[in-house]
Structures are given as structure tokens and as C-alpha cells.
Design a protein with these regions (language model features):
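N-terminal basic, low-structured, amphipathic or hydrophobic segments
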Residues: 11, 15, 27-33, 41, ...
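Non-transmembrane, aqueous-exposed alpha-helical and coiled segments at domain scale
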Residues: 72-494
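A general signal for intrinsically disordered, low-complexity N-terminal leader regions
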Residues: 5, 18-21, 45
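Small-residue helix-boundary/cleavage micro-motifs
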Residues: 20-23, 32-33, 38
Length: 494
């Protein structure tokens, strides 16, 4: 009988159906499930990839074994299921232990992933979080927009912290560049919006993606060719300076920009190459890949609370277009969500609560990793998270910041919205309508006890266990991980 092992490796129990090359070693794991030892999985065995545990193999297999211990063998997309700042950096850091490659697929240095390890705090903006673990390769994909100056600064900061950066970092030659005029235009646009600001980080991300869509952007491949880069940059500086001067802003110096970016390009040259080919060859060798998302579902340019969004696709689909890896090579999607809800910047947040916000700020929590801005806080929003699960095809959820509710009693949970007297179970597309939605709450008993020392589910207070089960039920997705603190060790694997 044919079976699917380890979330995606297809083999046949019929010896005649197996390739003649190599041996097949089947073991029984600690969970009592049979699986193939990863060291013995030949390239020819990875013939059929399934995306979910519940799906049958395309070859028509009718039986399968699912090994939770080896779930990290799968190619995994990790996405934020809220408005960003869900604690993805910590979850990525935990998952990275069982993968070989970590890939960033979209966004720029407007995002910030915070990772705590052995008392040290690391904030990463462009480089994937896997850089903090030895033996992992980090890839910045074609969907990312890169400010070379900012990237070099991040590399220098990490090296000062004795983090090795060399052959473990690859940068796509197709990634677009963020240039000085992008930052200036971003700032000027935000200033002129007055009271109707989007809340941009003013890092030039939106204008850079605008040039990409208009097919006039500069890419890393241009930067690797000094003459080509200088020619293209000169034309763009002339174009943008007309716009900037019309807005009353200082023009960009072509000479300064050209010299600084070419110098940065030479320093980055050893890292730049064809990352699409690298990733496909890695998959052929059975390497495990984690696709690291930036921001969150409701900041997605298509599916977010437009126009209060970022300029890239932050949902699971963006991981494929931003890396060149086809959808059928993805085995699972993990959504990360806080035990409550937060948002930085403008835009609707239906479950926002000022009292909860003030309490969390008083505890030193909820300040943006990139800008340091105070985050707006609200109760857990099951309406939004259910919709995020639908859009991303989330297979399992990781809850973070459960310890943030240790002193809260009672706890509210938003189970639906009310708009013009009508109950809504999905968020409206229009930003104005979403802003006018009233949350419909249910109340859950708090636990009034610390959770940060819990290392397995049974060690959580009974009320905390009930709470996480409840939000799992509301979202319709199983929980795989609970974070009760910033350190790697402060994690409960379910």
C-alpha cells in the first residue's frame, strides 16, 4: 500500500515500485508512527508532495502515516495572522532548529523581527531570523525590496555581536532596490496626507514597489554592473528630482547616491546570485525550507485593510511569487497570532481597547521593533483570524504572548462584528465600514497566575488551557505552539 510519510515524502510499500537506487529505512518514532529516516530519503522518493495532512497523495494513495516529530521536515510557510508584530521572529527562531534554509520573500527594512536568546535581544529587518542559528542558510528572495545601505548596517551590527555572516547568506539578483529618492518621496507623501496618514515607516518601501510595478525599478543585478547601474540611476534621479522639487523637498545628489550604492554593491557582491535555482536544487537534495513572512495578513496589499496596508503580498501566496518556489512544493502553512490583537499605525482595529493598551504599555510591552512606536492593542479577534486562516490556507496556529494576559480578568474575545444592526462573521472589504464595525464580545475567565515557567500544556493554569482551546475552536485551526515568553525555551510545543 502506498503511504505518505513525514508530511510529504511519498513511497510505496511495494518493493517493486521503489527505485533501485539506495535503501529504504523505516523507523518508528517516539509518537509510535512509522516514518522514513530523512538520511535515507533519496531524491527519487520525493515524487509527490501533499500540502495538508488531510489531503490524499496525488498518486491516489489511500493510506498515510503522519509523524508530528518530523513535521519540520516539510517546506513550511510562516505568516502573520493579524496586523503584524505577532511574534513571528520568535516562532521562526524555534522552527529554524529543524530546517536547513530560511527564506525571506517580501517586504523590506520596514519590518522588524525580534528574537531573544540567552538574554540578548536581536532585531532583524532584512536578514532572515535563521542567521542566529549555526548551520542554517538564509536567503533574501526576489520579492524583497532591499536598501543596500541598511542591509550592510544590519550585517555589521550582527557581526559585532559575533554572528557569522558569510556563505550562509544569499541575496537574489532579481530583488529590487530601495534608493534615496524612494525614502524622500515616501516621507513627503506621508506629510501631505495630513490627518489621513497611512502610518508608513518612511523607509521608501512603497515607492520602491511602485517602481517595480511600473517596470522602471533598479535591481540587485543592475547594482552588480556599475556602468549599467550608474546610467539607470542617473535617469531616475532626474525624474524623481522633478517630483521632489515640486513638493518642496531637497533633491537627491546623483554623485553621492551613485558612489555610496556602488560601494555597498561591491561589499554585497559575494552574497548575490540566482536564489531560485539554489532553492530548487536544495529541494531536490531533500533540504527543508522555512519561508519567513514579514508583517501580517491584514497588511497585505490585496487582502488587507486597504489603504492602510503595506505594498507587498504578506499572505502565503506571496511566499511563492517572492521566491520562485511553486505552490505544490509547500507542505504546510503556519499562522502566528497573539493571544490578543495589536496594530501599529493607522487603520481600523475593531477590538481595540484603551484600558488593555495602557496596561500592556505599563508592563513595557507592545512597542514596534522597527520604529519604536506604541502599538495599539485590542482583544483577540476571531473574525479576523478566521478570515486570515481562509486566505492563507493555514494548517496550524502558533499563539504568542499568552503571558501578556496573566493579570487580565475577565478576558474578552471578539466573536463577530455588528455593522448597521447586522451581524457580520467576516470583515468587510471597505476600510470605512470596518472602522464602523462594533465588536461582539464573549467573556472568558482569566487565570491571574504566571505562565512564563510552563514548558508543557498541562503546566498552564486551567483557565489558560481553556482560553487557548476556545480560540482554537473559534478559528477552526489546530494549535501547534504556545509562546509564554521571549526566550526560545519559553515555548510549549503541542
Amino acid at each position: 500500500m502506498n503511504r505518505v510519510y513525514s508530511a510529504g515524502v511519498w513511497v510505496s510499500r511495494n518493493p517493486g515500485a521503489l527505485p533501485a537506487s539506495g535503501g529504504l529505512k523505516i523507523e518508528r518514532c517516539a509518537f509510535g508512527a512509522e516514518h522514513i529516516n530523512a538520511k535515507f530519503v533519496a531524491r527519487s522518493y520525493r515524487q509527490h508532495i501533499i500540502r495538508r495532512q488531510s489531503r490524499l497523495c496525488p498518486a491516489g494513495c489511500i493510506g498515510k502515516i503522519f509523524c508530528p516529530f518530523l513535521i519540520a521536515m516539510a517546506n513550511t510557510i510562516l505568516v502573520g495572522a493579524q496586523w503584524g508584530d505577532e511574534g513571528k521572529g520568535k516562532i521562526i527562531d524555534v522552527l529554524t532548529a529543524k530546517v536547513d534554509i530560511v527564506v525571506r520573500s517580501q517586504g523590506g527594512n520596514n519590518a522588524g523581527h525580534t528574537v531573544f536568546h540567552r538574554g540578548a535581544k536581536y532585531i532583524l529587518h532584512l536578514i532572515p531570523s535563521g542567521i542566529l542559528r549555526r548551520g542554517k542558510v538564509c536567503v533574501i528572495g526576489n520579492g524583497v525590496v532591499i536598501d543596500p545601505i541598511a542591509l550592510l548596517g544590519e550585517i555589521d551590527r550582527l557581526r559585532k555581536l559575533r554572528i557569522t555572516i558569510g556563505r550562509n547568506l544569499l541575496i537574489s539578483d532579481c530583488a529590487h532596490l530601495v534608493l534615496p529618492y524612494h525614502r524622500l518621496l515616501d516621507e513627503q507623501r506621508e506629510l501631505r496626507r495630513g490627518h489621513v496618514r497611512i502610518g508608513t515607516t518612511k523607509r521608501g518601501i512603497g515607492p520602491a514597489y511602485g517602481d517595480k510595478a511600473a517596470r522602471t525599478g533598479l535591481r540587485m543585478s543592475d547594482l552588480m554592473q556599475p556602468i549599467v547601474f550608474s546610467k539607470k540611476l542617473h535617469a531616475k534621479v532626474i525624474e524623481y528630482n522633478r517630483i521632489l522639487q515640486a513638493l518642496g523637498a531637497k533633491p537627491v545628489s546623483f554623485r553621492e547616491a551613485n558612489e555610496s550604492y556602488l560601494a555597498a554593491g561591491e561589499k554585497l557582491r559575494p552574497f548575490v546570485g540566482n536564489t531560485v535555482v539554489y532553492l530548487h536544487r536544495a529541494m531536490e537534495r531533500g533540504k527543508r525550507i522555512l519561508f519567513e513572512g514579514a508583517q501580517g495578513t491584514f497588511l497585505d496589499i490585496d487582502h488587507g485593510t486597504y489603504p492602510y496596508v503595506t505594498s507587498s503580498n504578506t499572505t502565503a501566496g506571496g511566499a511563492c511569487t517572492g521566491t520562485g518556489v511553486p505552490p505544490h512544493r509547500i507542505d504546510r502553512v503556519v499562522g502566528v497570532m497573539k493571544a490578543y490583537t495589536t496594530r501599529v499605525g493607522e487603520g481600523a482595529l475593531p477590538s481595540e481597547d484603551m484600558q488593555l493598551t495602557q496596561m500592556l504599555h505599563s508592563l513595557g510591552r507592545e512597542f514596534g521593533a522597527t520604529t519604536g512606536r506604541k502599538r495599539r492593542c485590542g482583544w483577540f479577534d476571531a473574525v479576523a483570524t478566521r478570515y486570515a486562516r481562509m486566505i492563507n490556507g493555514i494548517d496550524e496556529l502558533a499563539i504568542t504572548n499568552l503571558d501578556g494576559l496573566d493579570r487580565v480578568d475577565p478576558i474578552r474575545v471578539c466573536i463577530a462584528y455588528r455593522l448597521n444592526g447586522k451581524r457580520l462573521n467576516v470583515p468587510p472589504c471597505d476600510a470605512g465600514q470596518l472602522a464602523n464595525c462594533e465588536p461582539i464580545y464573549t467573556h472568558v475567565r482569566g487565570w491571574n497566575a504566571p505562565t512564563h515557567s510552563a514548558r508543557n500544556f498541562s503546566q498552564l493554569p486551567a483557565a489558560a488551557r481553556k482560553y487557548v482551546r476556545y480560540i482554537s475552536e473559534l478559528t477552526g485551526a489546530k494549535l501547534s505552539m504556545i509562546s509564554v515568553g521571549p526566550e526560545r525555551s519559553e515555548t510549549i510545543i503541542l
